[in-house]
A protein has these predicted regions:
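Extreme N-terminal starter segment of soluble prokaryotic enzymes
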Residues: 1-3
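Local cysteine-cluster metal-coordination motifs and their immediate loop/turn environment
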Residues: 8-19
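C-terminal scaffold of the Radical SAM
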Residues: 18-44, 54-313
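Short amphipathic alpha-helical interaction segments
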Residues: 315-328
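A short, conserved structural fragment
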Residues: 326-336
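Minor-groove-contacting beta-hairpin "wing" of winged helix-turn-helix DNA-binding domains
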Residues: 337-341
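Short, amphipathic alpha-helical interaction segments positioned at domain boundaries
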Residues: 342-355
Length: 355
């Protein structure tokens, strides 16, 4: 079993962000009280036993804008249920992840930290609505290493309207300088979501395939191993196990405002309104996924990652199309699974196989 916890609070709302996030306010104490109730209920409902939780991911929002002591009771609840080799990830922003916060979170059990850097360039940071700077990024990474984190991720965003070869070379130069301080990189192609500050501003996205190819190629030349369209690690042992579980279609519980869980072909949605969540944190609306939904999800997630496609989950006409892709060398076959050697065309392949 895998577990996700959502912390919705942020110092400010980034222009591209479509996740549920709120400015820190008087609801923080009430939220954590509701969150604990939610977690306890979910653990009982799904009968989670000792050593069953393989990964725990605390995301947001910005978990680092909340004092570490707020997480103590949550960890006390979860400790007996964590696998001895559990991966515990927590998102953080460079400006709010202080040395003390990092130290306290590590003492609680967090062993993987993920920094929402997004860019090293001041103009691009401003464009994205980020409130940190390059000095803060370096300081946060140094502090994470100082307190003993062995698994450190850094996020970058590319394909914005500001991106050209010169801008991407700037990002790569600074990434190279701090490469020794990280073990993992998430590089996301900017997506314009409907409920963001960038909505109705499609021109804010570059849509430049050649620049995307250039950027990915340069990341690989920095000796990062690409295991998903947006994720790179220095070694296979430093892959994010939690995200891998998503792509493998594993069961995961999710608690917190606007959280989405998955269990036995069903999706579980918590309340999207803060007051509603605080009043009734155990509420879930349930979506039963059809075999068609599951097949489509398996195709999209498998083709964009090293997970691949399980041949037993394909129907005959999909297998016929797969054979065409094999002949064209757009896929390869190994151990009863089909793999995509070029993640950049994953959506195109998935649509072809599902149509």
């Amino acid at each position: 079993m895998h577990f996700y916890i959502h912390i919705p609070f942020c110092e400010s709302k980034c222009n591209y962000c479509a996740f549920t996030s709120l400015k820190k306010n008087d609801y923080e104490k009430a939220y954590f009280k509701a969150l604990k109730k939610d977690i306890i209920f979910q653990l009982k409902q799904f009968n989670i036993q000792s050593n069953q939780i393989k990964t725990l991911f605390i995301g947001g929002g910005t978990p680092s804008c909340v004092d570490a002591y707020n997480y103590e009771d949550i960890f006390k609840i979860l400790y007996p249920l964590l696998d001895k080799n559990v991966e515990i990830s927590c998102e953080a922003n460079p400006n709010s992840a202080t040395l003390n916060w990092l130290k306290n979170m590590k003492n609680l059990g967090v062993n993987r930290i993920s920094f929402g850097t997004q860019s090293f360039h001041p103009k691009k940071l401003h464009f994205l609505g980020r409130i940190h700077n390059q000095k803060m990024i370096i300081k946060a990474l140094e502090n994470a290493n100082k307190v003993g984190f062995k698994n450190i991720n850094l996020d970058l965003i590319y394909d914005t309207k500001l991106d050209n070869k010169k801008m991407l070379e700037f990002e790569l130069l600074h990434l190279k300088k701090i490469k020794a301080l990280i073990t993992h990189l998430s590089a996301y192609n900017l997506t314009i979501e409907s409920n963001t500050a960038f909505a109705k501003k499609e021109h804010f996205k570059k849509n430049a395939p050649n620049l995307i190819k250039f950027f990915i190629k340069q990341l690989l030349e920095l000796d990062f191993f690409q295991y998903e369209i947006s994720n790179f690690s220095k070694t296979k042992s430093q892959i994010c196990k939690h995200n891998l579980a998503y792509w493998q279609g594993k069961n995961y519980l999710a608690c917190g405002l606007s959280a989405v869980g998955f269990y036995e072909n069903k999706r579980f949605y918590t309340a999207k309104n803060l007051k509603n969540y605080i009043e009734n944190p155990t509420f879930r609306s349930i979506e039963q996924l059809s075999s068609k939904d599951l097949n489509l999800e398996h195709l999209f997630l498998g083709l964009r990652s090293i997970v691949g496609i399980d041949e037993t989950k394909l129907n005959q006409w999909q297998k016929d199309k797969i054979n065409i892709l094999l002949k064209e060398k757009k896929l390869f076959y190994k151990n009863k699974r089909y793999f995509n050697p070029n993640f950049l065309i994953s959506d195109e392949l998935a649509l072809y196989l599902s149509s």
